[in-house]
Amino acid sequence: MAKRIDVSGLNAYYGSFLAIEDISMTVEPRSVTAFIGPSGCGKSTFLRTLNRMHEVTPGGRVDGKVMLDDENLYGAGIDPVAVRREVGMVFQRPNPFPTMSVYDNVAAGLRLNGKYKKSQLDDVVEKSLRGANLWNEVKDRLNKPGSGLSGGQQQRLCIARAIAVEPNVLLMDEPCSALDPISTLAIEDLIGELKERFTIVIVTHNMQQAARVSDRTAFFNLAAVGQPGKLIEIDETERIFSNPSVQATEDYISGRFG
């Protein structure tokens, strides 16, 4: 079930360095929210705080709240691994497990989280590959290495792997940056379908992509190199691209900087 994200007063650190400062926003369920902004503005760091991947980096920590419906993901006793089951992630470069088959890539998370009969795994693998619009392309090569697929197919395999464990939220960190235009279009079409089931947040440097796929867009910026990134504004995507409230947003979108 897709869930709502409410972030309030969030600061993220690497050691003593404040990477992002005082971020507050709401991400509605069954929607696509895009994060845009210049390199180094903290949008990917913020994305990673939404499933506690930020903590994997030595010295990574946050203060503030990230609520998934009524649950504080940083509350006492909350297991970060359990958080990452609820809030899945797709990374910038396709990263299928290189020694695993297509089938085993999709089934990996299920096997890690519990015991399943072969028939149950078969059903979930097919459902997930269909959900990622990949089934018809790989159904006859399920036992072949996932690394043998094309780049676009590998990224859809990673999406299938992420949705197999039925998360509530799907985070995507520049999922098309390493792909050709045809593969990018396939991923964008897939995002439009997946938002019917999941809450989706995507980081992208491609503003045309943000305009095409998202319902809401958040613009991040920083005052100078070495300063923390901040959320400048978030609004309906059409409004952000046609009539933003902040001059810096308009300057970035129009190409005056960034």
Curated annotation (Swiss-Prot):
PANTHER family: ABC TRANSPORTER I FAMILY MEMBER 17 (PTHR43423:SF1). Disulfide bonds: none annotated. One of its GO terms (molecular function) is ATP hydrolysis activity. It is an enzyme of class 7 (translocase). ATP binds at residues 37-44. It comes from Streptomyces coelicolor (strain ATCC BAA-471 / A3(2) / M145). This is Phosphate import ATP-binding protein PstB. It is found in: Cell membrane. One of its GO terms (biological process) is phosphate ion transmembrane transport. Belongs to the ABC transporter superfamily. Phosphate importer (TC 3.A.1.7) family. It is a peripheral membrane protein. Part of the ABC transporter complex PstSACB involved in phosphate import. Responsible for energy coupling to the transport system. GO terms for cellular component: plasma membrane. The gene is pstB. The complex is composed of two ATP-binding proteins (PstB), two transmembrane proteins (PstC and PstA) and a solute-binding protein (PstS). It catalyses: phosphate(out) + ATP + H2O = ADP + 2 phosphate(in) + H(+). Residues 5-247 form the ABC transporter domain. Transmembrane segments: none annotated. Gene3D superfamilies: P-loop containing nucleotide triphosphate hydrolases. Keywords: ATP-binding, Cell membrane, Membrane, Nucleotide-binding, Phosphate transport, Translocase, Transport. Its EC number is 7.3.2.1.
